[in-house]
Every structure is written in C-alpha cells, then in structure tokens.
Regions:
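Short, surface-exposed secondary-structure junctions/capping segments
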Residues: 37-42, 233-244
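Detector for intrinsically disordered, low-structure N-terminal pre-sequences
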Residues: 29, 143, 228, 258-260
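Metal-dependent nuclease catalytic cores that hydrolyze phosphodiester bonds in DNA/RNA
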Residues: 1-132
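Mg2+/Mn2+-dependent nuclease catalytic core
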Residues: 105-239
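Generic recognition of cysteine residues
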Residues: 19, 67-68, 79, 134, ...
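Intrinsically disordered, low-complexity regions enriched in polar/acidic and amide residues
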Residues: 8, 119, 181, 248-249, ...
C-alpha cells in the first residue's frame, strides 16, 4: 500500500505535499510560478487596483465548491444569498454525471490510499514529474470518463483566441488555457496513481449572469499535458538553481484551440 499523502505549510506559507516520500508543489503553484514576468506584473497591478478582490474571489470559489460537493453527495445545498447567482445553473451540468468516482475525495474504496491519514483531504500526484493536487470531480457521463473543474468568474471563459483589443475575451482565453493545463495535470497524475485515464475534461464556469460547460477532448488534453510537463521542468530547474525551503523538519499533520461549449 502506498504511503499516505500529507499537506504541509512551508515556513513562508506556501503549500506543499508529502507524497511517496517526496515534497511536491501543487499544480497551481507550478502554474503561477512559471507565468511570464509580464503576466506576473499584470496580476500585481490588478491587485493594486482592486484591493480585496482576490480574497473575495477565493471566498466565492470556496462557497460554490461546497455547494457542488454537497449536491453531488446528495446533501441539501445551502448557498449563501450573495453567491446564489453563481450557483444557479451549475446543478444542470452536475446532473449529467451518472457515475461518480471522486468529489474532492475518492468515492471508491480502491482509491482510498489517496486520502490523507485523517481522511479529510485527498490528492493525486506524479512522482515522475513531481507535483500534486486535488481534482474537483472525476466521473462518467454515458460511459465516457470525465474530469471536471468548477470555476467562478466575473466574466465568461473562451476557448478561441479573441479579436485584437478584446480585453475581456483575452482574459477569458487565458483563464481557459490555465484551467485546461490544470486538468491535464490532474488527469496525468490520476492515471499514474490508479491507472484511470479520463477521456475528456469539463470546465464548469459560473458568472453572475450565466453558466458555461466547456468540454476539452482527449487530443487537446494531451497537448495541454505536454505544456504542463514543460512548465514542471522549468519550475524544478528554477527551484534547483535557487535557495529552497527545507520542509523535512516540518511537523506532519494528522491528516485558438477549439472545444465544445455547451
């Protein structure tokens, strides 16, 4: 039986995972750290212009993730009024799933080794490419294996490169590409850990006005997987060339690309 995974906070506040004896960065850490200097500067400027917006978005995302998880587990959904516009419409996409294997944590006993010691959290990880993370949903729709991710946003996502000058479209395209790489990374790690290879990915995006379901087929996921692997290599090369935190003494807890848009 593989070692139980653990989630660890480093002295600087970053999140790492101890899996199979390796201290691994999260998928989102890899993606954020390997953004271009221009993108990082743009995010800093946006945060300066919109104080508190990042924290508000995180709180909104946490609330909607809780609604999705409760719905999938057959628990009555109690959505705070301020987030209800973001929840409305998400359930119609969740109802497509006729078989569930993972909802934040494994729903099948043969995947329980992916749970932490206290069973409160669970992760998938790649020992080959050295990263870890937690998918939102893995299941099946009509026998098709699907990995899904829940997103809330102030604007819609788009899977096609926008016209020149379309700043909103460009933002939606960048978010789509980042999420596609994130799900490709989870898909790869899940296959490495339990031999379950998802056929497609589904991004479920909610805004105050609408909800989108964007499918990404297997061929596109393969391309995004290669992009993520390159970013992993870049991340670890940079980590090797810089002074890194020693996590070993930390106390362990007890615990322009088309896709179908629906």
């Amino acid at each position: 039986m593989p070692d139980k995974p653990y989630r660890i906070q480093t002295p600087s506040g970053h999140r790492k995972y101890l899996c199979s004896g390796l201290y691994l960065p999260s998928v989102t850490t890899v993606l954020s750290a390997t953004e271009s200097s221009k993108s990082k500067a743009g995010l800093r400027q946006w945060q300066e212009r919109n104080p508190g917006a990042l924290q508000a978005a995180a709180a909104r995302g946490t609330a909607i993730h809780k609604c999705c998880e409760d719905f999938l587990r057959g628990i009555e959904v109690s959505c705070p009024d301020e987030y209800r516009p973001f929840w409305n419409g998400m359930d119609q996409y969740l109802e497509w799933f006729d078989e569930l294997h993972w909802s934040e944590r494994p729903l099948r006993s043969d995947w329980n080794h992916l749970r932490s010691e206290d069973k409160e959290v669970a992760f998938v990880w790649s020992t080959e490419h050295k990263y870890a993370g937690c998918p939102d949903l893995v299941g099946e729709i009509g026998g098709v294996k699907v990995i899904a991710d829940f997103k809330t946003s102030t604007g819609p996502y788009t899977n096609t490169f926008p016209e020149r000058g379309d700043r909103i479209g460009y933002g939606g395209f960048r978010k789509y590409q980042k999420c596609a790489q994130q799900m490709a990374a989870y898909r790869l790690a899940l296959g490495e850990r339990v031999g379950f290879r998802c056929d497609v990915a589904l991004i479920i995006v909610s805004t105050e006005e609408t909800t989108q379901g964007i499918f990404i087929d297997g061929d596109q996921l393969d391309l995004y997987e290669q992009r993520f692997i390159k970013r992993c290599q870049m991340f670890h090369e940079n980590e090797d060339n810089n002074e890194t935190e020693d996590c070993s003494q930390q106390e362990l807890p007890e615990q322009n690309e088309p896709a179908k848009v629906c």
